[in-house]
Amino acid sequence: GIGSTGNQLTVATYNVLNLDPVVENVANVDDMDAGEVDDDAGDGRFAAIANQIVTALATPDIVGLQEVQDNSGAEINDGVVSASDTLGALVQAIVDAGGPTYTAIEVAPAVAETNGGQPGGNIRQAFLYNAARVTLVAGTAGTGNDSTLPQNDAGVVGLSFNPGLIEPGNTAFAGARKPLAAAFDFNGQRIVVVNNHFSSKGGSTPINGAIQPFVNGSEGERRAQTAIVNQFVDDALAIDANANVVVLGDMNEFTFEEPLQILAGADDSSNVLSDLFDVTGLDQLERYTFIFNGNSPAPDPLSVPAAPATPSPAGALSPPHPHSPNRPVPHSPHRPLTSGYELP
């Protein structure tokens, strides 16, 4: 089974759906639209997400979060970009649910309203990590303008900024989320995790709909974005061919479409990444994490094939599907996933 014990490092991905710690003032949200106002704390979303991390995901050593909003939620034009309060509230909720005290890390956007998503929210990726189990490699944290690069750290892969964003100034990420990379040490081994939230599939038409060929919204953007992350992995492997790299997040893509083939390296035959669903042979019926136009893609955590032993997405550990009828207010638009890696 999968658990944060002994030599097994556990890594999870969780889209937390515009999580923020405040009840917005309707006068300060986009178009003064009451639909932009929410109360994630009062509605129990922090507690529910924390409970899933503790019980369903069994307190992973590292949790990659997507759609973390800033401290003022959807309020606009207030100069707020940090998500320290949002992450702090989630860390406390996990403690209240019986979990460990995680350390949260993020790189806030350099300029407000440049990451897309709900106006004012400035969504970004972040990591939670259990410092009792893993160590964030010492270094300089990047800013929203800094681009982190793999570098040689005594024979293993380090990062020029840790944590850091990957090419935040590249036009491929204009109006979209920038990949967040972080390097950790576990049991004397280095692991680099890349947390993504690629451009949405907005504007898509159903695969089997009346419009053929179907429209895959923003596919061109995702092709460019995945190529950049693929190059980052290539650069890491050029430093250490046996590097432990995990690429996870909300890919907003079907596994059979070109952007994820580019990400994995299938288009250039480098094949640097493998889909964990394929590596572990998880049943096809369990490979759903999201319902889009009647189809069930996955956020697709990926691993470098050289990563040791048997990484395995936790089908049995995953919480109930967020769109099940007994959950009228989804805590996440995606099914969270966790994976285990034997690192002796």
Which role fits each region the language model picked out?
Residues G1-P344:
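Divalent cation-coordinating acidic motifs and surrounding scaffolds
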